[in-house]
């Protein structure tokens, strides 16, 4: 599902954020990406959905060749890769319904399908009753749940979660993780960057640790491994 071979990413300022990454993530896997701040986790995550382009190497995501991909092909990749951000990135002037529908409208989904699918994903995140509200009428946890609903609206094969609980209190963080677990149980591949030691050590999954742009640890049912 996700393959990286000898992947490097060097920025114009000379910083090397990926220094020979090699990893194979299978269909349906749930993988935590951990490591110190500035270790290269965000670059690793962003290369998977082509927000960043690797300097050299090989990256395959669901049969898409990301190194040689043309910019015009990126939207096709992102139909198959959903992304959840720490800061939600909801459209503040649009309702909950409109935020989720927009993700499908841009890929020209039929209106009848959009309506049905919006309600399906809102049911998954337990927010059908908030469908007509604006983002600023929601709590932080509710906004993140809407962000997750939007990210899976197109039924992606891969879901990228970049610090999805970073701005949330502990109870709300567990609510978000329960939703991600349910999505994982339905067969979606999930790659989640996190600094949350308790979550990683409690909800056991594969753990990949990155330091100085290198994978230094890759363990099934792993531990967080860093002091916080």
Describe each PLM feature range.
Residues 49:
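Helix-to-loop junction immediately C-terminal to a conserved catalytic motif
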Residues 57-65:
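Conserved ABC transporter NBD signature motif
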Residues 94-101:
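Short coil-to-helix segment of the ABC ATPase nucleotide-binding domain corresponding to the Q-loop/switch region
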Residues 133-138, 142-144:
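Conserved ABC ATPase signature
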Residues 153-157:
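A short, proline-enriched helix->beta-strand linker immediately N-terminal to the Walker B motif
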Residues 159-162:
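Catalytic Walker B motif of ABC-type/P-loop ATPase nucleotide-binding domains
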């Amino acid at each position: 599902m996700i393959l990286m071979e000898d992947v490097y990413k060097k920025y114009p300022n000379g910083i090397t954020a990926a220094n020979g990454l090699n990893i194979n993530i299978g269909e349906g896997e749930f993988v935590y990406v951990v490591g110190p701040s500035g270790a290269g986790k965000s670059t690793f995550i962003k290369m998977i959905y082509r927000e960043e382009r690797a300097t050299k190497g090989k990256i395959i995501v669901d049969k898409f060749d990301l190194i040689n991909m043309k910019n015009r092909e990126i939207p096709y990749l992102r139909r198959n890769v959903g992304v959840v951000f720490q800061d939600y990135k909801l459209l503040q002037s649009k309702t909950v319904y409109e935020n989720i529908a927009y993700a499908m409208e841009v890929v020209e989904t039929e209106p009848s399908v959009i309506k049905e699918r919006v309600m399906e994903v809102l049911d998954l995140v337990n927010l059908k009753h908030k469908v007509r509200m604006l983002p600023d009428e929601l709590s932080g946890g509710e906004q993140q749940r809407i962000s997750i609903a939007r990210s899976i609206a197109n039924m992606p094969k891969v879901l990228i979660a970049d610090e999805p609980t970073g701005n949330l209190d502990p109870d709300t963080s567990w609510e978000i993780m329960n939703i991600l677990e349910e999505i994982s149980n339905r067969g979606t591949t999930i790659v989640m960057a996190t600094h949350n030691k308790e979550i990683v050590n409690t909800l056991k999954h594969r753990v990949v640790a990155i330091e100085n742009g290198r994978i230094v640890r890759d363990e099934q049912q792993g531990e967080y491994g860093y002091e916080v």
